[in-house]
């Protein structure tokens, strides 16, 4: 009681200046209430009614007591109390009536209900007698509240119905990629094989012999799982080695591995944004959901700048005081349109306005740069090409060196799973120590980390896969352009075909799969804005000329069958998202130059592809892979065969 009084005095000036004797006297002296039927009141209550805080508390207390009295009267059988109120049923009309799917209410069985009344054998005798007496008290039981409970199933069904109505419901195709027949897969039936044209395993590293051998050996030695979080038995030599490799790849002091890059982005932005005082995060309008989620979780102020718009970004930076901490969050390659950020110019703005940069290289690591470190490395290609690995001493001032935080994935070009951040030792240690997304989750399995480490080292030594993938991408884009099929212009390895309608995109994807044995996933809202629906194609080193010809022929047929707009149609309408806009074509030249792709003067694209593919064959044999074609395309009308990817 004394502790409660001390706490109350700290909050209330009246209690603070009144002595205990005065309070006791006021609390015991009573007089009739001024309210009809209000009984008596203490003098302390009368004084409290004049207090702006206590008067509200007393009003709430009075309302609760009144409600309790009414409920007790109804339970005691007072005539008219609660009479005529129908008992709610799950089958009654309401939200559920809006849906075609119905359901029967779940009823508790009588036997189960009886069993629930039994007294636990562990109770003491005194407690048994008390519980028994309480259970046998005669009289009616209180009625349940008259309001109907929330209909959870109706809520779920309503949300799903919205997705169906706007054609954004996501369907999942059963696609089982075959390691020895890359880029082939079988569907739910092993006899039904298709060619996968939308995988993010961009280089086929998911079936690379060196990676698989490392994973097999590690799995046999160290088992399936890590055994715990990084702090509790889940930290091991594989994590240490992988993080050292990643830090070296990006020329940073340290790196930290997460279960995915979604978690890495979310955890890092949420932690920095919430811990830095008055932090402001400036985010590109096309940023990935993981970054948007992290910014939201941070609670920091957010400013969204127009996609790749340096003027808009600088305007927003200039509006903020120099002393305020600022994070510019953006991506190098935007995966759904293939655009590439002006990284160096953003670094210039960050330096000018006292901001730090957060660069997501998820769709670029393994794909760009002499060692596969991403677009930031690629922008200084010649400097890094002369290095065995990124050397911080000799690469000071390069674009990659200027980036404060780099995030990437192990699950796309490296063919495994997981995500990471790389930066200064102080930054990485801060995230390691404060980010719940890192602290409270199980570490990646040893075999996964060892496999990813091997994949990164492999791609740092070999340019062949990146070059072949880029040549195949050029060939596919050119073939579509020749047939007036609308490719959204971009300088990267992404091939987005504009459809512009959610239902048509789904139909096109279905027809390619069912009639041509080609798997390309439709991309709809919210991944892309409504009206910008598309098919997203990602060539790999394993997509040979026969496979490319089959794809282009099939897409052309589907476009004709469904009457989907051609590039010339979009041009006649004034152009859209770069399609049908000549300036957009000129501005989006490939980031890989002819010289970087080892193309010879006057050499045709197909000749360069064939030469690079043949150059990859000895390496494939040395890696233990078959150099000759394996498997056949069951649904391919041209009867092509699939060679093992050069990535092997």
Swiss-Prot record:
The modification N6-(pyridoxal phosphate)lysine is found at residue 412. Catalyzes the synthesis of 5-aminolevulinate (ALA) from succinyl-CoA and glycine, the first and rate-limiting step in heme biosynthesis. Signal peptide: none annotated. This is 5-aminolevulinate synthase, mitochondrial. It comes from Emericella nidulans (strain FGSC A4 / ATCC 38163 / CBS 112.46 / NRRL 194 / M139). Its main location: mitochondrion. Homodimer. Residues 1-26 form a transit peptide. Belongs to the class-II pyridoxal-phosphate-dependent aminotransferase family.
């Amino acid at each position: 009681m004394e502790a409660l009084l001390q706490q109350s005095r700290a909050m209330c000036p009246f209690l603070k200046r009144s002595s205990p004797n005065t309070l006791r006297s006021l609390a015991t002296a009573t007089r009739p209430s001024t309210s009809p039927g209000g009984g008596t009141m203490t003098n302390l209550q009368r004084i409290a009614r004049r207090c702006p805080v206590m008067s509200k508390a007393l009003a709430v207390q009075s309302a609760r007591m009144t409600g309790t009295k009414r409920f007790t009267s109804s339970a005691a059988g007072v005539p008219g109390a609660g009479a005529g109120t129908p008992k709610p049923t799950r089958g009654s009309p309401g939200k559920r009536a809006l849906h075609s799917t119905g359901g029967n209410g779940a009823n508790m069985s009588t036997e189960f209900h009886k069993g629930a009344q039994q007294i636990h054998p562990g109770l003491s005798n005194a407690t048994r007698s008390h519980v028994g007496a309480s259970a046998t008290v005669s009289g009616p039981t209180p009625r349940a509240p008259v309001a109907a409970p929330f209909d959870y199933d109706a809520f779920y069904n309503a949300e799903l119905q919205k997705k169906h109505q706007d054609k954004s419901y996501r369907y999942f195709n059963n696609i089982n990629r075959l390691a020895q027949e890359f880029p082939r897969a079988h569907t739910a039936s092993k006899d039904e094989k298709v060619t996968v044209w939308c995988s993010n395993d961009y280089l086929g590293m998911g079936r690379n012999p060196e990676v698989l051998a490392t994973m097999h050996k590690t799995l046999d030695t160290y088992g399936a799982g890590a055994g715990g979080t990084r702090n509790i038995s889940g930290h091991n030599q594989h994590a240490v080695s992988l993080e050292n490799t990643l830090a070296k790849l990006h020329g940073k002091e340290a790196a930290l591995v997460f279960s995915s890059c979604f978690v890495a982005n979310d955890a890092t932005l949420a932690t920095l944004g919430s811990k830095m005082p008055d932090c402001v995060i400036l985010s590109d309008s096309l940023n990935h959901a993981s970054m948007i989620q992290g910014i939201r979780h941070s609670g920091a102020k957010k400013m969204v700048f127009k996609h790749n718009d340096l003027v808009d970004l600088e305007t927003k930076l200039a509006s903020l005081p120099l002393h305020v901490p600022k994070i510019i969050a953006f991506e190098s390659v935007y995966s759904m349109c293939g655009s590439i950020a002006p990284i160096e110019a953003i670094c210039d703005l960050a330096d000018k306005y006292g901001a730090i940069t957060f660069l997501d290289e998820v769709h670029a690591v393994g794909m760009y740069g002499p060692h596969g470190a991403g677009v930031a490395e690629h922008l200084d290609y010649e400097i890094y090409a002369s290095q065995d690995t990124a050397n911080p001493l000799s690469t000071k001032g390069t674009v990659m060196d200027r980036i404060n935080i780099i995030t990437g994935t192990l699950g796309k070009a490296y063919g495994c799973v997981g995500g990471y951040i790389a930066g200064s030792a102080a930054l990485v240690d801060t995230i390691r120590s404060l980010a719940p997304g890192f602290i409270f989750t199980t570490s990646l399995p040893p075999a996964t980390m060892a496999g990813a480490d091997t994949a990164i080292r492999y791609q740092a030594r070999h340019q062949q896969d990146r070059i072949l993938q880029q040549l195949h991408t050029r060939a596919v884009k050119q073939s579509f352009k020749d047939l007036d099929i609308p490719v959204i212009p971009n300088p990267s390895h992404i091939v987005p075909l504009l459809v512009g309608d959610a239902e048509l995109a789904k139909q096109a994807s279905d027809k390619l799969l069912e009639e041509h044995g080609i798997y390309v996933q439709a991309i709809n809202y919210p991944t892309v804005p409504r009206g910008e629906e598309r098919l997203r194609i990602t060539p790999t080193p394993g997509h040979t000329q026969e496979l490319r010809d089959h794809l282009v022929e099939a897409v052309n047929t589907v476009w004709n069958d469904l009457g989907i707009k051609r590039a010339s149609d979009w041009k006649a309408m004034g152009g859209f998202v770069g399609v049908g806009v000549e300036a957009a074509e000129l501005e989006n030249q490939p980031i890989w130059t002819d010289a970087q792709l080892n193309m010879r003067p006057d050499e045709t694209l197909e000749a360069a592809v064939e030469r690079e593919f043949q150059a990859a064959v000895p390496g494939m044999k040395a890696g233990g892979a078959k150099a000759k074609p394996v498997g056949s395309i069951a649904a391919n009308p041209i009867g092509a065969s699939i060679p093992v990817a050069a990535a092997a």
